[in-house]
Amino acid sequence: MSGNAVTYRLGRNCKLYEGTAGAEATTEVTHAADVATNGTRERINITDRQLAALGFNGYASGLADLTITIQARRVANDAAVGAIRTAFKSASPISLKVLNGATGEGVKGDFVISDYNESQPINGAVDISITAYPTITDDSFPPTWIDETSG
């Protein structure tokens, strides 16, 4: 069997950064365990009589809805997770950047922290569950998709 070697992206090599709203996030969140970038698009119904006669609804893609979910370990004096917690408590935006590798693809921009939940199991580590939604605080730093070449 011959062919090209397959290079997989491993979660442990992915990166999450936080920073001051309005600027690119540069502080790595090292105690993040699981991070997910979740995207959906609105479905706009454009059914007309022609499609209806064929028995189908027709749709167009609408605006994208993006969330970042983060599972992190609660570690004393962790400045990066502390900055995210402060953003939640003060209802202030925070800059986040998620990459699927050290120089991979992902998303960056300003986000609001809508959910900040702390789990305290009797027989386990304290974990934090965070959900972030994009916002805009500065016209020069809108939420942006990052591809392999744009960094």
Where are these regions (language model features)?
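Short, surface-exposed, polar/charged, turn-prone segments marking secondary-structure boundaries
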Residues: G58, K97-G101, N123-D127, D138-P143
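Acidic glycine-/aspartate-rich tracts in secreted/extracellular proteins
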Residues: R73-D78, T135-D139
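Short acidic, gly/pro-rich beta-turn/loop elements at beta-sheet edges
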Residues: D78-A80, G106, P121-N123, S140-P143
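Protruding loop/beta-arch "assembly-hinge" segments enriched in small, turn-prone residues
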Residues: M1-V6, V126-G151
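Short, acidic/charged, Gly/Pro-enriched secondary-structure junctions
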Residues: R74, A79-S114
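Solvent-exposed edge beta-strands and adjacent loop segments
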Residues: S2-Q71, D110-T131
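Extended hydrophobic/Leu-rich segments
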Residues: Y17, V29, L99, W145-I146
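Secondary-structure boundary/capping motif
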Residues: Q71, P93, Y133-T135
